[in-house]
Amino acid sequence: VFAATGPVEAGALGIEGAWGKACAKPLHSCDFCAGTSPLPSGLAFRVTPAGRRAWFGGIFKGAEADFSMKVTVERAELLKSLGHVHRVVERRNTIPILANVLVKADRGKLSLKATDLDLEVTDSIAAEVSPGGSTTVPAHMFYEIVRKLPEGSQIVLEGSGDRAVLALRAGRSRFTLQTLPESDFPDLAAGEMGHSFKLAAADLKRLIDKTQFAISTEETRYYLNGIYLHVAGTPKSGTLRAVATDGHRLAQVELPLPQGAAGMPGIIVPRKTVGEVQRLIETGEGDVAVELSSAKIRFTIGNVVLTSKLIDGTFPDYARVIPVNNDKNLVVDKKDFEAAVDRVSTVSSERGRAVKLSITGGRLVLSVTNPDSGSATEEIEVDYAADPLDIGFNSRYLLDIAAQIEGEVAVLKLADPGSPTLIQDQDAKGALYVLMPMRV
């Protein structure tokens, strides 16, 4: 119930009140809508549902509450497209429009867009459109409805009239979804991107897969909450390098510099963006177009366009923690080492996960002692010619790094029990890992 501060025409804008009836006039036709009629103080009135939709849908600004569209699309195509965009939408939103996906139909194409204000994903698919139109609907509900429809379904999306709902039909199933106007939907993709280049999806996938595990989840050090992507070396012989670290371990992977990337600034791509890009290039097929500025990055993968803000911070001078004088080389069979670490760590404490490596000659003994649950030891054959050494590591971190080694042999370059260890694949170049030791 609202208290008016001036005279109101009978039923204006869907108002019921002193006249006991709703307005029969079309919206925008009365003095109240036009803003020319004064309002008498103390008059109580109620706004009808239609009036509320008009009021809060931006009717005073001339925004159109109604929308008309009709789209026919294959269920499999719509589900795949929704799968690309709906993950961006947070489950809990204080801003209603951010819980929605923008649905836009025009000229034989259906476009879907979702955003969380930091990340935006757009996808488009072929569809029968007559007429075109646009609106927004709840993203996760829309996805779940389409997912649960039978395979092979033809889906019809239709909006018309002033009900502000999108109707969905497939076979004998009927749904209606509440909508919010397109005019409320934010556009993150706007703005110029000063640098652009292309690279194979397989190369981008390698950069991400081999560094993502080391991204920090500690929000206080926000500048570590992503992958640092930058040019290393000279423009002629440089590389595109990806680095991630959480302060306990560091991953660095590089590949030949793509054409056009030489002048790009160093950027930090957020963890959520990295995860979404990783899903989109899961097959590693085709090329990816990359555009970026100092504040945003855009990936175009087929029909999918992902635009993201970058982390506004300075990545630390990671080169200082990469050891260059470690002269104790421990050469291990990757599978044997990984399996042994996994077995003995079964009894480690959930908090510490410490595993001790005792190295003498051609023998490595891995041991774990947990006062609360027990102990474990295992011995494997290795290649090691330096002085005997005892050193401890977090077993989970060791396993994370071992999982990135593609070849049969891993090399651990050691110094002493208190210094970082450099780990590399003996057969593959372009990737290295640094792991800080722990007391055992």
What is each residue range found by the language model?
Residues 1-13:
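Extreme N-terminal basic, low-complexity initiation segments
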Residues 6-7, 18, 32, 37, ...:
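Intrinsic disorder/low-complexity segments in short proteins, especially the signal peptide
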Residues 10, 14-17, 158:
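N-terminal hydrophobic alpha-helix used for membrane targeting or insertion
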Residues 23, 30-33:
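Cysteine-centered motifs
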Residues 28-31, 47-51, 55-440:
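Structural preference for solvent-exposed beta-strand-turn elements
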